[in-house]
Amino acid sequence: FGSLLGICLLTQIITGLLLAMHYTADTSLAFTSVAHTCRNVQFGWLIRNLHANGASFFFICIYFHIGRGIYYGSYLNKETWNIGVILLLTLMATAFVGYVLPWGQMSFWGATVITNLFSAIPYIGQTLVEWAWGGFSVDNPTLTRFFALHFLLPFVIAGLTLVHLTFLHETGSNNPLGIPSDCDKIPFHPYYSTKDILGFALMFILLVSLALFSPNSLGDPENFTPANPLSTPPHIKPEWYFLFAYAILRSIPNKLGGVLALAASVLVLFLLPLLHTSKQRSMTFRPLSQILFWALVANLLILTWVGS
């Protein structure tokens, strides 16, 4: 899935650049500029649908990638793993600021709710939130800085990806048995490069099918209404890929406790290399660990379902 993540990033940067050419980062124009892109720009609708659904595929791939890393003990490549977790955090930040840009109802209220979480930080919280907003509520300054961040962060992700690969290159990649595979090494090209094309093709078929047949199935219908600070939508919820974290946040009655639990749900990945106690690297021959692993997967799926 690593190669798929790379191609996801490339696709998102290309479609994003094309969208940025037609986008206006201003509260009075953002929503109409997105509508204009979809109606009047050649293939604008397609570019936007690919970009919006490409984000979903990015997260599908990264969750599979992390799951596989946990299952096969890849986290023992500590540097690679830690940079991977930082990549995940950067991706989540990018997706969040990007979701605010169309300036629909859910964009606005999502931004309000999530940035408000920073106010739970003792002592500096409120100052921090007003500093992030550039005022006393989510408004024009917030939108413009979010656009700047959404433009910048994908390139940060690309840079971190290179570091991620450099550290991976130090040790070589892992395998399902978790044993050294030096004797089985083969040239990357044409073998792996050809194998990766199959994954690219399958993912593109799925992505294009989704973008062409039901482009709005993963989005929130509230976002077809321009942002209105005076009317709160009945259910504020993020895109599906954040629902597990949002469910954790909402399930804890205390604000600071919820924020800490939400942060911990992702940051716990940093602890995995320290918590590995088995003599074997991979879970292939560890049925007990397998049960725990699949329980974790089931938990995440249930949280995602509950969160919606």
From Swiss-Prot:
Which chain regions cross the lipid bilayer?
Answer: 1-21, 45-66, 81-101, 146-166, 194-214, 256-276, 288-308
The UniProt entry lists membrane topology as: Multi-pass membrane protein
Keyword field contains Transmembrane: yes
Please report which protein family the annotation says this sequence is part of. Answer: Belongs to the cytochrome b family.
GO CC annotations on file: mitochondrial inner membrane
Q: Any miscellaneous information on file?
A: Heme 1 (or BL or b562) is low-potential and absorbs at about 562 nm, and heme 2 (or BH or b566) is high-potential and absorbs at about 566 nm.
Name the residues that bind heme b b562: 51, 150
- Which organism is this protein's natural source? Baeolophus inornatus (Oak titmouse)
The record's subcellular location field reads: Mitochondrion inner membrane
Does Zinc appear among the keywords? no
Record's protein name? Cytochrome b
GO molecular-function terms, A-Z: metal ion binding; ubiquinol-cytochrome-c reductase activity
Biological role stated in the UniProt entry:
Component of the ubiquinol-cytochrome c reductase complex (complex III or cytochrome b-c1 complex) that is part of the mitochondrial respiratory chain. The b-c1 complex mediates electron transfer from ubiquinol to cytochrome c. Contributes to the generation of a proton gradient across the mitochondrial membrane that is then used for ATP synthesis.
Binding partners and assembly = The cytochrome bc1 complex contains 11 subunits: 3 respiratory subunits (MT-CYB, CYC1 and UQCRFS1), 2 core proteins (UQCRC1 and UQCRC2) and 6 low-molecular weight proteins (UQCRH/QCR6, UQCRB/QCR7, UQCRQ/QCR8, UQCR10/QCR9, UQCR11/QCR10 and a cleavage product of UQCRFS1). This cytochrome bc1 complex then forms a dimer.
Name the positions where a ubiquinone binds. 169
Primary localization: mitochondrion
Q: Which PANTHER family match?
A: CYTOCHROME B (PTHR19271:SF16)
Its needed co-factors are: heme b
